[in-house]
């Protein structure tokens, strides 16, 4: 149990801006093997990030005047909260992949471009479009009129968004681990943003990772119907399968940036699936 907590805190330290310092950092410890093992808690980071996003959305819905644009403003600031909390870690991967694969059809040249820390035209477009998709879908979910059952009071539609944010951040962080399991790592580990993390994962590690996801889905079912969650997860899985095929064809494997891209695309797909099912 203590090892479980250490690995989780190491993942928190690595994937978020939350400080794990001083005596706590000494207790957690560090080694390349521990960092690799902490990858199974990738979905668990979604508990924190998604929780912060949901709290921001709910707070602004409560404090702001009730207008047509309130869900849009709340969605925008909840997205800002997630970007700040993660340091744009996954968005950076999306931009690098867009620059690399958009800038060259040659595999080696694409990998070289992806190592460049500068953001190009393709990366900028991908970032803007991804953020717009997130905000638009969350605002749409927040503006859905919740239809009550006979004899029940009208439901608070913001719970849709809070449940979507929390669950979407968890599920979308579990699916990239399937990519680690199925594809070889083709990046330069010495300079990879994920370092020894983006290497390999066992079936047992996947089981731990998906226990986070299944637990989140079980709790989310209190706010969302099962069919909503099934469709949302279905969209995310389809996005994952598409990216697996795409990266296998273009790169013959994955890099740390590909994992960040997968998280972003699967998160958007989750919100889209949820919106379609409501």
Swiss-Prot record:
Pathway where it operates: Cofactor biosynthesis; adenosylcobalamin biosynthesis; adenosylcobalamin from cob(II)yrinate a,c-diamide: step 7/7
EC number: 2.7.8.26
Top EC class of this enzyme: transferase
Catalytic reaction equation(s): alpha-ribazole + adenosylcob(III)inamide-GDP = adenosylcob(III)alamin + GMP + H(+); alpha-ribazole 5'-phosphate + adenosylcob(III)inamide-GDP = adenosylcob(III)alamin 5'-phosphate + GMP + H(+)
Major place of residence: membrane
Compartment list: Cell inner membrane
Topology relative to the membrane: Multi-pass membrane protein
Any GO CC annotation of this UniProt entry: plasma membrane
A GO BP entry: cobalamin biosynthetic process
Keywords: Cell inner membrane, Cell membrane, Cobalamin biosynthesis, Magnesium, Membrane, Transferase, Transmembrane, Transmembrane helix
Top-level taxon of the source organism: Bacteria
Keyword NAD: no
Cofactor field: Mg(2+)
GO MF annotations, alphabetized: adenosylcobinamide-GDP ribazoletransferase activity; cobalamin 5'-phosphate synthase activity
TM spans (from-to): 44-64, 69-89, 121-141, 161-181, 204-224, 227-247
Family designation: Belongs to the CobS family.
Protein name: Adenosylcobinamide-GDP ribazoletransferase
Gene source species: Polaromonas naphthalenivorans (strain CJ2)
Gene (name only): cobS
